[in-house]
């Protein structure tokens, strides 16, 4: 038995009008200066080519394709940024040239040639990794969460890979772990550097979130992560900046049960180019009295999340959160002009913030909730505004124990500038949809059991609009935006990805991608990544899901035998032209926060679905 709670008193028409008034007031957000990202993928006959439309160039930009100096297209290509060349060979060299007012204005670098295919719908290549030796405590290493950034400023993405030891532990379980390592690799497999977080950072899903982003606008990404005495940077040096200047790097602060509930805690920013320490500050929120977080042995005090957000509108900041089961705290940080400074802090223990206790998830999301050109931080049941003030939480409207395990935030209605929040709840349980600026839900299915998963996305172009589903009895139904049942839900309640060429998303679960047909109540398998595996156990996440190159659709990365990463890209045709998702700031910061605790799929900052308008509104961005 479940209860369908009817919509709260909320005038969406009035809200939409109000929110629309704010559109156009925002500054341009700084994003990466990307290259064209041209790839050529081997097919049964010839090659399939795919490249970026940049968010900084006119939507109508035309392109010419050249193979070995010969132009292949008769008329400029003004549709989807893909092209098939049936006469290409592995020895061919491809470039694409952009046209402005009929004249060619730039030429891409030669295409990355991808010679391996997985069935008719995907190409792939492998990135060799330098697997660490077995740890001092017997832990063997596997590549875990991965992030992307332009570390050297060449306009191409590099990868930052977290190595997790096999003796990693959840916060709820005792045990001593080996060290956590961060590696940086080019897509060709060159190891750029390795950071060792040391023995005073415990290994586990909730301990280390690493933010990879160009925080200072110098055209290269930095890495910001929690550190401690014993952390060694990518140049082989113990960290020595700020409060770490006189740190005892030989000290071991973990106790006999493996928890680390004493000793210094830092936040360090590292140079993406060489892994060198740039600056270190005292980590905030501080640990303080361990029992103030809900237990005394070290579980809830060390529940961390992190994200990147454009809090001031133009430049990105990092946000690090501590605690969500009881006390909820976070701090925003800026890396500017060679200094790491705290922008603001939020603490549910401060007067006026008491209702925010327990109002947090196992992840964060980021969106422009107020449509004012600045990002807010969504903890799931709560929203913290761009100035570090609590905007709202659902303690009184939905669930006093607002904690949940999944979170989806994006624009979900055509023509509506409001982002919406969909999430499952633990405790009293259920699935709820609400506008991101309000605690008042549109609908709330309340079953009274723990809902561990929930997803929001348009799944089928034949059934227009966003679809919502989750685990549990209610979750076996598929709902539309109005809370009406439209079919059965798929068995996958995990990631969603743009893959097959339409504007709906496909199901990404474990090492498979499937298209769900609502009316036929069945999936179509599009990809099985043979030999590759997902990460995080039953969470079955990819190492990374992101639009790394090629057209606007997403790539997916899996672990291959702990020695390689395998990168898959679609070869399915599309008729749609969109700028690279990585130039949409909301999507781009989602790639940064994707590695936070329970990984969630990235969503864009504007409405992408079958009934969207074309061309999409220009992105308000600039490059360094």
Give each language-model segment a name.
Residues 2-14:
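Bacterial N-terminal signal peptides that target proteins for export
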Residues 11-24:
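Bacterial N-terminal signal peptides
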Residues 31-35, 46, 53-58, 76-624:
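Beta-propeller-forming repeat regions
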Residues 39-44:
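Short, solvent-exposed loop/linker segments at the N-terminal edge
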Residues 54-68:
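Solvent-exposed loop/turn segments flanking beta-strands in beta-repeat/beta-sandwich domains
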Residues 71-73:
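Ser/Thr-rich low-complexity repeats and stalk/linker segments
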